[in-house]
Design a protein with these regions (language model features):
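Two-metal-ion acidic nuclease core segments, chiefly of the RNase H-like superfamily
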Residues: 75-93, 111-118
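Alpha-helix N-cap and loop-to-helix initiation/capping positions
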Residues: 32-37, 67-75, 107-108
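Short, function-defining helix-loop hinge/capping sites that tune catalysis or transport
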Residues: 22-24, 66, 117
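Conserved Lys-Pro-Asp/Glu-containing loop-to-beta segment of HAD-superfamily phosphomonoesterases
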Residues: 10, 105-131
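Substrate-recognition element of Asp-dependent hydrolases with the DxDx(T/V) motif
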Residues: 41-76, 90-102
Length: 131
């Protein structure tokens, strides 16, 4: 891991139930439309003033056929843009679409966190914007 990351304010957040919740009140959304941003959480995030917000999520419903992967990707893109804009930070996300608990990308395993740091934050930190 890059030494420059030690000086960065990076926040990892879970998606469902933390950053968003269903409008219907059900545990699982009825469709991609059944969600609302949790502004109480977003306001708390703004106070932390992170440079990066990295969203992680288990989405086993994709593997089970309950959730369409393309529709979920569009929903996630909207969430990333909305949160990044509202919290004024770089926002990225990654999800695991399997229910296999031994998958290194499935939370609580750490590969998804490591990959987000390597692919987004570390690349950004190492970019030479002057040349």
């Amino acid at each position: 891991m890059n030494e420059n990351l030690k000086n960065k304010n990076i926040l990892f957040c879970d998606l469902d139930g933390t950053l968003i919740e269903t409008i219907s009140g059900d545990t699982f959304p009825k469709g991609i439309w059944d969600m609302k941003l949790r502004f109480d959480v977003l306001d708390a995030i703004k106070k932390l003033n992170p440079e990066y917000e990295l969203i992680v999520s288990n989405q086993g419903g994709i593997e089970n056929g309950f959730v369409d992967a393309q529709k979920f990707s569009k929903k996630l893109f909207y969430i990333i843009e909305a949160i990044g804009d509202y919290c004024d930070c770089e926002c990225y996300a990654m999800y695991c679409d399997t229910n296999n608990e031994s998958d290194p990308y499935r939370k609580p395993n750490t590969k998804i966190l490591e990959t987000l740091l390597e692919d987004y934050v570390e690349d950004f930190v190492n970019t030479d914007f002057e040349n």
